[in-house]
Amino acid sequence: MLYFGECVLVYSKIVCNGLWFVYNVAMDRKQLTKQLNNQTLIIWDNLCELYSPLTKYNPPIIEINGRIYRTAGRCHQEDNLIHMGYKFFLYSKEFYNNMFNIILPHEIIHQADYNLFGLSEATCGHGKKWQEIMINYGLSPDKHHNMWIK
């Protein structure tokens, strides 16, 4: 991976007819953050339709963290902040899509759970209330992702 200001040049491998090819993808961190924040607003609005008390809260702030390697995302409920693992966006198109469609809502729902029910043993983490919100949002309440970066 090479850094050029706000852009990152990523070298990845693809297989075509059994042959490995190397291709590079330029990913602008600012543009990615903007896309994540736009998607966050959509997800938050959908959650507010399901749970009207959420309308009195601001959607969480999204930050990209290049130091997260195993965790795709991490919600810091008391700070209304979500860190997303940058490497997962760069690894493959499938991981990129999973980060937007599964991991981002998963982390936002942690914030919604905290805003609705507070921080307690019953609601913290992947408790029953969080699972209920995930299901009502249309996602499987999985605790872990299956995206492994080598």
What are these regions (language model features)?
Residues 4-102, 111-150:
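Active-site-proximal or metal-binding-adjacent scaffold patches in catalytic folds
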Residues 107:
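Walker B catalytic acidic pair
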